[in-house]
Amino acid sequence: MFRIGQGFDVHQLVEGRPLIIGGIEIPYEKGLLGHSDADVLLHTVADACLGAVGEGDIGKHFPDTDPEFKDADSFKLLQHVWGIVKQKGYVLGNIDCTIIAQKPKMLPYIEDMRKRIAEGLEADVSQVNVKATTTEKLGFTGRAEGIAAQATVLIQKG
């Protein structure tokens, strides 16, 4: 049996925080605002995985009202989510992710992001795709006020 999940997330860019995307810290003058480390890409991946097994979203599992998750490492959250998927007997088919950001440029970090996501999903890097695009300076991402990400995952019974 195959199942598909889709994830989407957005975080505001602010001064005074590190920029962590796909489990990789990216040198930039701003970082993403959030209760956890605000890793927009890993949140998206986790949401896609939870959706594929009908387990809601990361807000249900890691509420931003719970102090336990303050500044949480999103990679650890993803590993927990993947544990739920595995417990239900699924393995990764593949995942395709898109980062939507005007700045900074993501290309130098894409391969490291792919490797980190593959590690979190206990998969081969060939099963993980990450790409980035801009909105041609339109909207909040185009004005570099925030970063968005989306992902689609295919899982199958192992």
From Swiss-Prot:
InterPro entries in UniProt: MECDP_synthase, MECDP_synthase_CS, MECDP_synthase_sf
The protein's enzyme class: lyase
A Pfam family of this chain: YgbB
Cofactor(s) demanded: a divalent metal cation
An MF annotation (GO) of this entry: metal ion binding
Null allele phenotype: Cells lacking this gene reveal a loss of rod shape, irregular septation, multicompartmentalized cells, and thickened cell walls. It also induces a decrease in isoprene production.
Site description Transition state stabilizer, residues in chain: H35, T134
Binding residues for a divalent metal cation: D9, H11, H43
EC number(s) recorded for this UniProt protein: 4.6.1.12
NCBIfam families: ispF (TIGR00151)
Family: Belongs to the IspF family.
Name the UniProt record assigns to this protein: 2-C-methyl-D-erythritol 2,4-cyclodiphosphate synthase
Organism of this sequence: Bacillus subtilis (strain 168)
Lineage: Bacteria, Bacillati, Bacillota, Bacilli, Bacillales
